[in-house]
Amino acid sequence: MELWFSDYHTDKVKMSVKVEKQLFGEQTDFQRIDVFDSKEFGRFISSDGSIVFSEKDEFVYDEMIVHVPMAVHPNVRHVLVIGGGDGGVARELSYYKEIEEIDVVEPDEVFVEVCKKFFPDNARGLDDPRVRVFYADGLRFLRSKNDQYDLIINDAIDPLGHTAGLFTKEFYGNCYRALKEDGIMVYQHGSPFYDEDEDTCRAMHRKASHSFPISRVYQAHIPTCASGYWLFWFLSK
């Protein structure tokens, strides 16, 4: 019997991947986590039924969200990653020897442990001695931070469920205060391809632009993300 995993992009569109077997499944305090093995994408992990990343294309996401701001900012020393429990963003940041401190704030400890077990190439980023992992809510974590970071990367999954607070006006305002004068914030902006998702992207843009005077969008093709067309938002003071 064939086993397929389907990620529903809308109620009329889905992406299905033939899987060899399921490697893990558990409901945590924050989300439903499943790990599958497939021939086409290798191992992939899902959260509440939606693919988070796969071994085959995770590099596109992690490289785009890290190396673009690093290419622009000449003096990044202190970095905050909101989410990022898989370690992929920390891995890409670890290539920059000038970075002194990488704080990763991830609410779900189970997610981190699952990624360490099944996605070691990502999770090795968390082993860098400059990385500090805080198991906390990103919104609350930021409330006490002022003028501390050169770069903030919001690696949260999407503006739903336990990550909804990371796409609010309060969150963007807290990020603005936590950044130094020449600081940069980057976050995954989702896909505007489907009508409902386009509305979500516009709403996120309005909230972020309320705090940051400089805002730009860049894009990448990531096959396992909804529609494959993925945006990233670049914000600066």
Regions found by a protein language model. Name each.
Residues R43-D48, N154-A156:
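Gly-rich Lys/Arg/Thr-decorated short loops/hinges at beta-loop-alpha junctions or inter-strand turns
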Residues G190-K237:
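Substrate-binding/catalytic lobe of Class I Rossmann-like enzymes that use SAM or dcSAM, i.e.
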Residues M1-F44:
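N-terminal auxiliary segments of SAM/dcSAM-dependent transferases
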Residues E2, F53-Y187, Y194-C201:
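The AdoMet/dcAdoMet-binding core of the Class I SAM-like
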Residues F30, D182, Y229-W230:
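Active-site lining segments that contact anionic ligands and/or coordinate catalytic metals
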Residues S6, F44, I184, F232-F234:
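Ordered hydrophobic segments in well-structured contexts
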